[in-house]
Amino acid sequence: GTFLMSKLCIPHLLKSENPHILNLSPPLDMDPLWFQGSLAYTMAKFNMSMCVLGMAAEYSGKIAVNALWPRTAIRTAAVANVLGGQEMYDKSRKPEIMSDAAHIILNKDHKTFSGNFLIDDSLLAEHGETDFSKYADYPFDQLMPDFFVPADGYPVPKVVKES
């Protein structure tokens, strides 16, 4: 889906003033932990991430291609109804954290900001956000972590830990 949708949109994006493709996909991490018990889902998400790598190189300077991924679970119907019920939903962050992060990415210069794998709260902290409490009803240490966030490559910003 990601490849086909991008392929069909590229001719139109090339005519745009500041064209971007933003995939909601994780940083690539070959830790077997992410493959065990969820191989099909992992393959699907990492496929989207590989599209970021390939398309960012192929359209360098013409179309920005980046990936955004949440550090914690996000309040969606899937979380409430499929993954974890009301408790997991309540201990997830609000979708606004992703939209605020996406807004930052989509306003970057497409010629210079491409091929990045970004974690929502890290990006927001880098751009001056200090109040992460508005994105959740529980303290950070009680939130449900999301899948695919490598522990070593994307440390939690200090301002996030404190909120």
Report each predicted region and the residues it spans.
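Short alpha-helix in the Rossmann-fold core of NAD(P)-dependent oxidoreductases
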Residues: 1-2, 6, 44-45, 90-94
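Catalytic loop of short-chain dehydrogenase/reductase
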Residues: 10, 14-61, 69-74, 80-85
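Hydrophobic positions on the long internal alpha-helix
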Residues: 1, 5-9, 13, 51-52, ...
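Conserved Rossmann-like nucleotide-binding pocket used by diverse enzymes
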Residues: 64
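Short, flexible micro-motifs
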Residues: 4, 57, 118
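C-terminal helical subdomain
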Residues: 67-68, 86-163
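Conserved long hydrophobic alpha-helices within structured protein cores
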Residues: 2, 20-24, 115
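Alpha-helical elements of the RecA-like P-loop NTPase motor core of helicases
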Residues: 3, 76-77
